[in-house]
Design a protein with these regions (language model features):
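Acidic (Asp/Glu)-rich catalytic clusters
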Residues: 3-10, 92-97, 120-130
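Internal, well-ordered domain-core segments that constitute the primary functional module
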Residues: 6, 27, 31-38
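Hydrophobic faces of well-ordered beta-strands that scaffold small-molecule active sites
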Residues: 10-14, 80-83, 101-104, 133-140
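Active-site-proximal loop/turn and secondary-structure-junction residues that shape catalytic pockets
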Residues: 16-20, 86, 107, 141-143
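Acidic/polar active-site rim loop that often engages polyanionic ligands
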Residues: 18-28, 96-97
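An alpha-helical appendage that flanks or caps ligand/catalytic pockets
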Residues: 33-69, 110-219
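A conserved active-site cap/scaffold subdomain adjacent to cofactor or substrate pockets
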Residues: 86-116
Length: 219
């Protein structure tokens, strides 16, 4: 419906989620989350493209009748962006389905580059061209007439976010089975785990606006 209302300008987002919502709020097994997510993605893609009513009999979802109306304007489907922290499985999912991988780098472009270097290696592994439209990353940017005005406008929000919002109990960040062996082998950490690590070890995370800007978290 949104694609029709916008005249074919919808960009769909398929976030994988975090352990806090999927595992602890909804009681899902962390070992099967990725498989269940992939099944859901396939259901949505088929619903967008299949012109007739169909049945879906998956391992986790069974639907007798699936019939999307109104149908998306964009053919064969709207573009899909997958926001993610850092996992090999998310890279593979994006490359197999021609989705855009959007790295959620709360810790700025320097941290994002480390993750995206791994993503481009995965692109090579899949023998696909390094099209720049395959990837993006989150970067907080404050716009103002001057540097001082930007500090005056955004310091309170930035300091609150990095000083308070990213304090995550490490017990919630990585339940057993949530991170796969393949992801651990390449040394990747999600943004949630990274934030929890900072909280647990009381590292010198930037808490002043000046430190936050100097470390590239906010430009």
């Amino acid at each position: 419906m949104l694609d029709v209302m916008s005249g074919g300008r919808l960009v769909a987002g398929f976030p994988v989620g975090t352990p806090m919502d999927t595992t602890y709020c909804y009681g899902q097994s962390p070992a099967t989350l990725r498989e269940k997510y992939r099944e859901g993605v396939q259901l949505i893609l088929k619903a967008w493209s299949e012109p007739d009513v169909f049945s879906f009999n998956g391992k986790y979802t069974q639907l007798r009748y699936v019939n999307v109306w109104p149908r998306p304007m964009q053919k064969p489907r709207p573009p899909v962006w997958v926001p993610g922290g850092a996992s090999v499985e998310t890279w593979d999912l994006c490359l197999e389905n021609d989705f855009l991988y959007a790295n959620l780098s709360y810790f700025g472009y320097l941290e994002a580059k480390k993750v995206l270097d791994g993503f481009w290696n995965a692109v090579d592994r899949h023998k696909l061209p390094r099209n720049p439209y395959r990837a993006g990353f989150l970067q907080f940017v404050g716009v103002a007439e001057s540097r001082q005005e930007a500090f005056d406008k955004y310091a309170e929000a930035a300091e609150y976010f990095y000083g308070r919002c990213l304090h995550i109990d490490p017990r919630f960040a990585q339940p057993p089975g949530y991170t796969t062996e393949a992801t651990m082998r390449v040394g990747l950490q999600s943004q949630v785990v990274k934030a929890a690590s900072y909280s647990e070890k009381f590292k010198a995370r930037p808490t002043s606006m000046q430190q936050i800007v100097d470390d590239g978290y906010v430009i």
